[in-house]
Amino acid sequence: MQRIGMVANLEKPRVRETALDIINYLESRNVRVLISTRKAAALGCPEKGVAEEEVIAAEGLLALGGDGTLLRAARLVAPAGTPILGINLGHLGFLTEIELTELYPALDKLLAGAYRIEERMMLRGTVQRPEKALTCTALNDIVVTKGAFSRMLRLEVYIDTAYLDTYPADGLIVSSPTGSTAYSLSAGGPLVSPQLQVMILTPICPHTLYTRPLVVPGEQEIRVCVHAPGAEVMLTVDGQQGLHLRDGDVIRVTRARTPARLIRLQDNTFYSLVREKLKEGGSRQDDENPAATVNPETDSKYPHSHPGSTG
């Protein structure tokens, strides 16, 4: 790779320092690092800024932060097919590929082409209104949920043209296999291998005893009709983007045309990640004297503690 894009969550500890060091490390190997004009200015190197379109069109993209940063990156570059390498400076790091301690060997592998691409199904959501249709894409999930002080919703659900049920519930989660380890899991949904092309429909606090999550083939469409006069209803995308819904809105969720493409440098399987990451339950504690990774170019050291955030 000769042109590598970078996105970074600069709100996280150590991200700014790490980003600047990565830039120096890659440039010393004749690799051009592409950063948006806004991010470059925030990093203190405005001369390196380029249009976002150039970042998207890079040969690969580094996502520095946590799982939330990778989710944003996936929505940004998936239509262009740009592969993403997630570098975890967050907390759990279920989606990211490497920890900070593995950074420089991982960059060397990337430049040597010693990696594979793993495709992850994404979701496309459309909110159908008389005046226009609003669209979104998600890697994890598209969620319809009530506001803090709203009564329960009545959500009429169809699979293609077949009526499924009307759910009296606090909301519904439509997740991808990747999102099956996120909000859907917390709401009682199943773990689903990311190799499958399916959607998972998981009700949130249903007001019936028989309602259970449902797995739907990826080639079908899930249609949700909102019946909630006077209630506050929200649609959220990967827990990061939101839209106020109206009574009578129709939400259509299908498999997106293009998948997210994740760079994999290691042999970890989904099943080993489930065992290792979910077993931690987000409760990993920092060591008293955390190990550090060393940049062979600068001898600068970065402790690999894990702050409690997923962005």
Swiss-Prot record:
The residue ranges flagged as biased composition, category Basic and acidic residues, are 278-287
Q: Which SUPFAM superfamilies match?
A: NAD kinase/diacylglycerol kinase-like
Main subcellular location? cytoplasm
Active site annotation, chain numbering: D67
Q: What is its EC number?
A: 2.7.1.23
Q: Report a single Gene Ontology molecular function.
A: NAD binding
Question: Coiled coil: which residue ranges?
Answer: none
* Biological process according to GO: NAD metabolic process; NADP biosynthetic process
Kindly give the InterPro entries that the UniProt entry links to this protein.
ATP-NAD_kinase_N (IPR017438), ATP-NAD_kinase_PpnK-typ_C (IPR017437), NAD/diacylglycerol_kinase_sf (IPR016064), NADK (IPR002504)
Q: Which Pfam families match?
A: NAD_kinase, NAD_kinase_C
The subcellular location is: Cytoplasm
Q: Name one GO cellular component term.
A: cytoplasm
UniProt keyword list: ATP-binding, Cytoplasm, Kinase, NAD, NADP, Nucleotide-binding, Transferase
> Region entry Disordered: which residue ranges?
278-311
Enumerate the catalysed reactions.
NAD(+) + ATP = ADP + NADP(+) + H(+)
Q: Which Gene3D superfamilies match?
A: Probable inorganic polyphosphate/atp-NAD kinase, domain 1, Probable inorganic polyphosphate/atp-NAD kinase, domain 2
Which metal ions or organic cofactors does this protein require, according to UniProt? Answer: a divalent metal cation
Q: Which residues bind NAD(+)?
A: D67, G68, R72, N140, D141, R151, D170, T181, A182, Y183, S184, L185, S186, Q240
* Family to which this protein belongs: Belongs to the NAD kinase family.
What exactly does this protein do?
Involved in the regulation of the intracellular balance of NAD and NADP, and is a key enzyme in the biosynthesis of NADP. Catalyzes specifically the phosphorylation on 2'-hydroxyl of the adenosine moiety of NAD to yield NADP.
What is this protein's record name?
NAD kinase
Query: What organism does the record attribute this protein to?
Result: Moorella thermoacetica (strain ATCC 39073 / JCM 9320)
Query: Which gene is transcribed and translated to give this protein?
Result: nadK
